[in-house]
A protein has these predicted regions:
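A conserved regulatory-domain signal marking ACT and ACT-like small-molecule sensing domains
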Residues: 1-131
Length: 131
């Protein structure tokens, strides 16, 4: 899975154009969101998404592998716990969202260290997306 970071133009319909363009080209969105003009979406085929979006005139900032984790969701405060564990080791979360399977998607300023720190949250979900 890949996070695609795009800066939208401040025009009505940019999200529609984005979603329709990817859909016409067989790229599905597995999660994500838009924050002002900054969009982050999870896709299976990162390079294909980049190519389609660039050819369609979108401002693609980055395509990268995010950390994919799973919170047990048994009690309030679990997101705060994983965020605190990262912060305690000097890792900043740059982007956080969920996918359609309720995985926690994280982009950090140090993904290698973040992967080590968040190891306990991988054990919460053993599937093809968590590693």
């Amino acid at each position: 899975m890949y996070d695609v970071h795009v800066i939208f133009n401040t025009l009505p319909g940019e999200l529609a154009r984005f979603g329709q363009l990817l859909g016409r080209n067989g790229v599905g969105l597995e999660g994500g969101g838009v924050f002002g003009v900054e969009a982050h979406f999870l896709v299976e085929e990162g390079e294909k998404a980049r190519r389609v979006l660039l050819d369609g005139g979108f401002n693609v900032q980055a395509v990268r592998k995010p950390l994919i984790r799973k919170l047990k969701q048994e009690r309030p405060g679990e997101l705060g716990e994983i965020a605190a564990a990262l912060a305690a080791q000097g890792v900043s979360i740059l982007t956080q969202y969920s996918d359609h399977a309720n995985h926690l998607i994280l982009l950090t300023d140090n993904d290698k260290l973040a992967a080590e720190i968040t190891g306990p949250w991988v054990a919460n979900a053993k599937d093809q997306f968590t590693s």
